[in-house]
Structures are given as C-alpha cells and as structure tokens.
A protein has these predicted regions:
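OB-fold/S1-family single-stranded nucleic acid-binding modules
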Residues: 76-93
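Short nucleic-acid-contacting surface segments enriched for D/E, G, S/T with interspersed K/R
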Residues: 17-20, 58-75
Length: 93
C-alpha cells in the first residue's frame, strides 16, 4: 500500500502542464470515473525529464484513435460555453 501512495504522489494533474512540446511515451488506462469516462495516466518528457500526468478523457481518446504519436503540444486551456475549462492539445508523428 505504501508503494501505491508514493506512486500517486508522482502523478500530476494535467492542469500542471506547461504550454509547449512534450515527447510522448504512452498512456495507460487506470479505470473509469463515475460518468464512465476513462481515468488514465500519460507519460510525457520535456527537457530530459519524464513526468506522469492524469490525462483528461479527451486526450485518452485522441491518443487511442491515432496510429502514431511522438510529440504532444499543450497549448493551454479554453473555456466551454457552459463555463468549463478544457485542455487544447496538438499531435505530431
């Protein structure tokens, strides 16, 4: 149990990402939330440092539907008409 807690501390919120380009190293599904949307963790690298982030559902589905992705560019957030912030990503092979 102790090991799982330490691992959880290393996983950051997607909201902690800095804008810019990251090398993509994979995404792992860890279950679903109360609304049936995937809870997943994405591993990204920037400046030689790998970090794990909880991925928004949109990122999970985008990456699962792409044949090849090597880089992800995080461009920040936009606000929906309902007032929710959501992330904006671009992808390249």
């Amino acid at each position: 149990m102790e090991q799982k807690w330490e691992e959880a501390e290393k996983i950051l919120s997607w909201k902690e990402m800095q804008t810019g380009v990251y090398s993509y190293h994979g995404i792992e599904r860890r279950g679903t939330n109360d609304y049936g949307r995937p809870i997943s963790v994405v591993t990204l690298e920037r400046g030689g440092v790998k970090k794990m982030f909880y991925a928004p559902a949109s990122l999970y589905w985008d990456l699962k539907n792409r044949s090849e992705t090597n880089f992800i560019k995080y461009e920040g957030t936009q606000t929906s008409a309902k007032g929710y912030d959501y992330p904006v990503f671009m992808y390249s092979a």
